[in-house]
Every structure is written in structure tokens, then in C-alpha cells.
Amino acid sequence: MRKIIRLLSLLIASVLFAALCSCSKGSEIRLGSGNKGGIYYNYANALSDLDGNITVKQTAGSQANMRLLKDGFIDMGIVQSDVLSEAIKGTGDFKDNKVDNARAVAALYMESFQIIVAADSDIETPADLKGKKVSIGEEHSGVSKNAEYIFNSVSLDIDMIDTCNMTYEKSAEALKNGTIDAFFVVLGAPCDVITQLSQDMDIRILPFDDRTISYMTNLYDGYYETVIKAGTYKGIDEDVKTVGVKAVLVASKKTDSNTVRNFTEMLFEENGEIKKKVELANNDLKFATENIPCGFHKGAANYYSSIGMAVKEED
């Protein structure tokens, strides 16, 4: 009998030890990013360098990340605020595919709409894109939807433009080779792909007039007026008015609360390390938590509460 009790005690101890070891190692966090050359991808990799439990998943961007989050293929993802708004409301491209399991963690930085053309192009405004060959980003990316909205803002139907879907890197190469006339980028400025392109050729960024900015910010949720400062890229010698969206980190409501809390804390406590790889990384708590389309994950809300900030938590 004593032998049986001793064996049971050893078995229980072994199970507890294994459980403790498993907890200390942590669980894998599948983080949806974006395509190479974009800040989502760089940001996600900066986070994975700080936490070995993070596995970066390269995706087509915001729309893909929302669908992957809904279907359980990723635990967290980076998405544009406007795409997040449509997804949780079940509108736009998510009309028949509403996402109800997304919870906010933090807004990471502002993304600016940047329409790039050659410096000697006859294209001066978004309205001049009619009949031109234009890359509007990858399919199922947020930028493709943004492009359609911008066309609408200047009374253009997407059928009036010869659009194609390419990554930012391939778009830059195509502009350099003269096979397209313009391409859309929705990234924080500066971004690597445009910085490199501006070294290889003379470029311009199309400005948005006040009417277009008003149309975009009033009609669509999650859009803000923003400015690309002179000197951001080589050859950009004047401020360029445009619109932007917030890049928001979201988590599935099923993602462990302690994991999300620790992740949220890392965003701010390790901001200096993140900035070494992503200059735009935000450390402003007000920016991170205000005007977010969905409620916050319990774990994120717990962190904000611990530093005296109240956010809207959603079950």
C-alpha cells in the first residue's frame, strides 16, 4: 500500500513539474503581419525578437488578418482601423463575413496614404489616375479597399482605372521600370520601400485637397487627416497633405488574458527596443487607446488599469 501511495505521489509530482515547465516556456503566439517591405512585417519581427513565443505569420495584410483571426489561424494580428471597423460591423468587404472575436490591444502608429508617381509624371492629383495603370496593393489587403474609396472621393469608379495587384516591393520595381504609372502605399512614413525607391529614381507623392480629405474623414470610420513632412523622402521638399488610418494590434477574444496583458506591457516597456527597428513605434497611451473601433481584450484592459487608465473592455 505504501508503495502504491509513493508511486502515486511521484506521478502527481511529475505531472505538476511538467505543467510548471510548460507554463514557464509559454504558449506560441501566432502573429499576423503583412508583406515583406511593409511596417507590419517589420513590427511583428521586432516583437518576436523580444518574445521567443511569437511566431510571425506573413500575410497579405489587414483584411487577410481579420479573416485569419476569425477562423482561428492566428491569435493576434495588425490591422488598419478602417478595416477593423468594417469587420466588426459586418459592412463593406465583410458584409457576409462579420468578425465578432476581435479585441483591441493597442494602436501602434499612424499609417499615411501615399500615392507614388514618377517626378516627371503628368499625374498631379488622384483624379488624374483615370485611365492609368495603377497598383493598388495585394488582393485582400486594406490598401486595395482604401484605393477604391479614394477613387470614389474624386468621382472615379474603379473600372475607370487599369488596376493591378502587387506587393509594395514589386510595385516600386514596376514604377521604376515604367510598367505602371502609380502605386498606392498605406504605411507609416517613412517606410523602407519608398525610401529605397526615392534613392533609385525621382518621385512625387500626390497631395489630397481639402474636399477629398473631408470626404474621406467624414464618410468612413477610422480615417484621419495627416501630413507627410517635407524631407521624409528624398525629393519631397514640401509637406504633403493626405489621410491616414491607425495600425491597430488586435487579439482573438480566446487568446489567454495573461498572455495579452504581458504582450501589452511589452509594447510600452520595450518601446525603445522596438523603435530601433520601427522608428514609428508609438509610446503614447492616449493615441494607443482612443478612437479604436472595437472594445479591448480583457488582458489589455488589465494592463491599462494597472497604470491608471480606463478603457472599454469587451467580453
Identify the meaning behind each predicted range:
Residues 19-22:
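C-terminal motif of bacterial Sec signal peptides marking the signal peptidase cleavage site
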Residues 166, 170, 176-177, 187-205, ...:
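An extracytoplasmic/periplasmic, membrane-proximal ligand-sensing/linker region
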